[in-house]
């Protein structure tokens, strides 16, 4: 697999979970002998929802809720078959979305 690259994108609402997952992936890849670039923090996506507090009137009384999506990018350069096998067996939390390209 010389000259190839694996790109892993992580998404999560909890920054501690995504950082722990990224750390676990980097440790696994370094142990198998491949080169790692990252984790690179990508811009955090922030969604703000405005809701009227009262069910019928009092439009001036509103409440704001926000949802932050944290993202990280990890590039694995020159992966070996051992690296790919170790990545398939790694156990990550369900709250972290992993996209491998």
Swiss-Prot record:
Keyword ATP-binding: no
Keywords noted in UniProt: Ribonucleoprotein, Ribosomal protein
Signal sequence segment: none
Matching InterPro entries: Ribosomal_uS10, Ribosomal_uS10_CS, Ribosomal_uS10_dom, Ribosomal_uS10_dom_sf
Keyword Ribosomal protein: yes
Record-linked Pfam families: Ribosomal_S10 (PF00338)
An example Gene Ontology molecular-function term: structural constituent of ribosome
A cellular-component GO term for this protein: ribonucleoprotein complex
GO BP term, example: translation
Family classification: Belongs to the universal ribosomal protein uS10 family.
Subunit (UniProt): Part of the 30S ribosomal subunit.
Chain's role: Involved in the binding of tRNA to the ribosomes.
Protein name: Small ribosomal subunit protein uS10
Gene: rpsJ
């Amino acid at each position: 697999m010389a000259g190839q690259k694996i790109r892993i994108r992580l998404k999560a609402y909890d920054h501690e979970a995504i950082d722990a997952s990224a750390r676990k992936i980097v440790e696994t890849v370094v142990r198998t002998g491949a080169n790692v670039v990252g984790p690179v923090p990508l811009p955090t996506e922030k969604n703000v929802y405005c809701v009227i507090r009262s069910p019928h009137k009092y439009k001036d009384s509103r409440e704001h809720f926000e949802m932050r999506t944290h993202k990280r990018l990890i590039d694995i350069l020159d992966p070996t078959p051992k690296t790919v096998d170790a990545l398939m067996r790694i156990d990550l939390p369900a709250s972290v979305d992993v996209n491998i390209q």
